[in-house]
Amino acid sequence: MKHNYKVKLFDELGFVRKKCKKCGQWFWTLDEERETCGDAPCDIYSFIGKPITKKPYTYKEMVKEFINFFKEHGHEPIKRAPVTARRWRDDILLTIASIAVFQPWITKGIVKPKANPLVIAQPCIRLNDIDNVGRTGRHLTCFTMGGHHAFNREDDFKYWQDETVELCFNFFKKLGIDEKSITFIESWWEGGGNAGPCYEVITHGVELATLVFMQYEKVGDNYKEIPLKIVDTGYGIERFVWASTGEPTIYDAIFKNIVNKLKEDAGVKDIDKEILAKITEVAGLMDVKDVGDLRKLREEVANKVNIPVEELDKLISPYEDIYAIVDHTRALAFMLGDGIVPSNVKDGYLVRMLIRKTLRHMDRLNLSTPITEIVAMQLNELKDLYPELLDMEDYIMEILEIETNKYRQTIERGKGIVERLLKSKKEIDLENLIELYDSHGLPPEIVKDVAKSLGKDVKIPDNFYTIVAERHENKKEVKEKIKLPEVNVDKTELLFYEYPKMKEFEAKILRIVDDYVILDRTAFYPEGGGQKADTGYIIKGDKKFRVVDVQKENNIVYHKIENLNDELKEGDIVKGVIDWKRRLSLMRNHTATHIINAAAQKVLGRHVWQAGSDVDVDKARLDITHYKRISREELKDIERVANEIVLNNYNIKSIFMDRNEAEEKFGFRIYQGGVVPGNVLRIVIIEDENGNIVDVQACGGTHCQNTGEVGFIKIIKTERVQDGVERLIYSSGLSALKAVQEMEDILEESAEILRCPTEELPKVIKRFFEEWKEQRKKIEELEKKIGELKKFELINKFETIGNYKVLVEKVEANPKEMLNIADNLATENAIVVLLNDKGNILCKRGENVDIKMNELIRYIAKGGGREHLAQGKYEGDVEEIKKKVIEFIKNK
């Protein structure tokens, strides 16, 4: 699409438009002699060893320099968002750019921005180049995107191309970057259905900023102008630091202290900086993703520094590991500090992958410094800019210790898994590697090592971790929705918010379609936010129609009627009656959900986040993120804190707030229940007598007006739903009393059976258990003796078939006793086949028998097992089985 890239600054300063003689891109420059666009691979990284700013900057200094510059130029600084984007979005897991903070609500024009124009320094996580980190000198998984953004409406236009380019140019100038070295490449950006022209801002071979002007929506192959025109800029803070120091790699510029510490610990010798610089320089001249196993990169560098490739490998490999470790641990500091709990799904999977990849790099170096210490160093470096991360240090350290132990156990257990797989497969392909990593946590390098010990080769793609990360980042949850008929009526007036205790109401029927009645107003709560729908009746005259379900879509509430007939007509005035006893239970349990969530955060830590809920009449469940099983003591503490909140009878208020105001005041923790659409949010607040927040959430559910109305809360049990997610099941009010009484009934019944007082149950049960174990031991000894006696009874019934002694016999024994008997008989070259009158069959062989018992049992009966022992079920008589056994052995 054609666009005019010429701006006021270019005219004023005499920029010229040129076409790059190497790549053919158009660009703007002050240097009339320049023939190339300035970007790699058309130009080399000429800043390495020759810093391009007036002074070297640290990461912290560059963040402050960036924020202060744009603040001085009329931009309001705003706080960073968490690196886990699913706190406010359901389409991506991680925050991948500064604009992601404002999507989708602000960029769609539904919500006004917190400030306009604004500036932000947003830490981001991108895993699409994870395999290149450490290898190329420039790739990072964790980086900070500086962004100055303007959201332009027709009636409130801030600035556009002229001002954006001028601001960027002046920022470069302020840093001391030579004006003639700066080029603005004309480009085009598309993403998320939007599009617009952009400039890539280059100096000395490296792109430092991108200036995007979002002004179109892409519809098929066409572009349509959008009313909200957005200035979306991205400045690479770490790249600015790198260019200001002239270090050979971006890692040496950002993580110098930690790199030096790890080099010392690993005993890695200093190598010529020219070698590191050449690797970075050559990597900048090629698309590393196309290099395959990076051999080409190695060969190019080896030629340039006159070192054999094998020697270069030995020199550079430890550096690549160190660089990957310092990058990954910075990412872990943010991911864990922002409350991500390692698990097998979503962002939990990605953080676990990063931990394990880091540990693998550390193992290759034989580092004595634990991962906890390296992340602690990162937290110390970040504490001035991000003090909130340091507040999570205890949690971060515990998580890392737990995950390290899990990783070590996985490696030990996994070797056997790989060996078994290789026995059944000729080779292990990419899908097998991914399955072993996803299901068993086995890094591909371990799989390769085990395979090598068995004489087999496994090929690992250089971009393995990128492939795995992309698969998990792109996984979408498909939630089943009730298909509702489309109707064209006004939105339904919701009475349950304004009048939360309304039990009856009058309304007019607007539409009747299928089994649904649509009213102009309703006090029936539609299913949503984890809370079940209200039920009750719609009454017309003396006729009652049962409401069995209520759903809401596009601001229209649908009332499903049981046995709907033509007595109800559109235009009728009817009365709605809520099943109030049911609603009251739902309200109590929903408020109890908020209370327990607050209690769990207080007892377990700020990493706790709601991962799902289901509010029903008799009980409710709350899924929370937590990295280990909740102990009995912790559970009692959660229950105690929850009931203290109830007894204190705290006020509960529900208010409608502007989205930005709510986020600014309460933070992203308001989205405990998931992503909430819209500009206006309903915020449910529980606060103590001093006005301190006990719990606050964006929630559309029905709630009590104070915590005392909830009544007694009883946590019935906990479950481990999946790794990293704990489920609490609980009841409130009379349902909680009923749950306690049911538990008491079980205790009383148990005490009656054991003929002891309930308070002595633990002691008596322990005694019975010890006695049972003793009796069990005696029974096993007797079974063993019976097996030995049976041996003498059956020893003379063996027949010789070829090289084997074979016994096929029916015995009076259960499967366990049959195994004892077979153990005594199946020695050396013996094959024992035992049957009983219950249809059980067992095949066992001696140590000198080559015939596989799992194959034998499949031939004579139905069953399975291992080569030396198999069990199953048979049909027919002993003679038929015996005939088949002999037939099978002779054929072998």
UniProtKB/Swiss-Prot annotation:
One of its GO terms (molecular function) is ATP binding. It catalyses: tRNA(Ala) + L-alanine + ATP = L-alanyl-tRNA(Ala) + AMP + diphosphate. Binds 1 zinc ion per subunit. Its cofactor is Zn(2+). SMART domains: tRNA_SAD. Its EC number is 6.1.1.7. Zn(2+) binds at residues 590, 594, 699, 703. GO terms for biological process: alanyl-tRNA aminoacylation. It is found in: Cytoplasm. InterPro entries: aa-tRNA-synth_II/BPL/LPL (IPR045864), Ala-tRNA-lgiase_IIc (IPR002318), Ala-tRNA-ligase_IIc_anticod-bd (IPR018162), Ala-tRNA-synth_IIc_core (IPR018165), Ala-tRNA-synth_IIc_N (IPR018164), Ala-tRNA_lgiase_arc (IPR022429), Ala-tRNA_ligase (IPR050058), DHHA1_dom (IPR003156). SUPFAM superfamilies: Class II aaRS and biotin synthetases, Putative anticodon-binding domain of alanyl-tRNA synthetase (AlaRS), ThrRS/AlaRS common domain, Translation proteins. Keywords: Aminoacyl-tRNA synthetase, ATP-binding, Cytoplasm, Ligase, Metal-binding, Nucleotide-binding, Protein biosynthesis, RNA-binding, tRNA-binding, Zinc. GO terms for cellular component: cytoplasm. Catalyzes the attachment of alanine to tRNA(Ala) in a two-step reaction: alanine is first activated by ATP to form Ala-AMP and then transferred to the acceptor end of tRNA(Ala). Also functions in trans to edit the amino acid moiety from incorrectly charged Ser-tRNA(Ala), and maybe also from Gly-tRNA(Ala). Consists of three domains; the N-terminal catalytic domain, the editing domain and the C-terminal C-Ala domain. The editing domain removes incorrectly charged amino acids, while the C-Ala domain, along with tRNA(Ala), serves as a bridge to cooperatively bring together the editing and aminoacylation centers thus stimulating deacylation of misacylated tRNAs. Belongs to the class-II aminoacyl-tRNA synthetase family. This is Alanine--tRNA ligase. It comes from Methanocaldococcus jannaschii (strain ATCC 43067 / DSM 2661 / JAL-1 / JCM 10045 / NBRC 100440) (Methanococcus jannaschii).
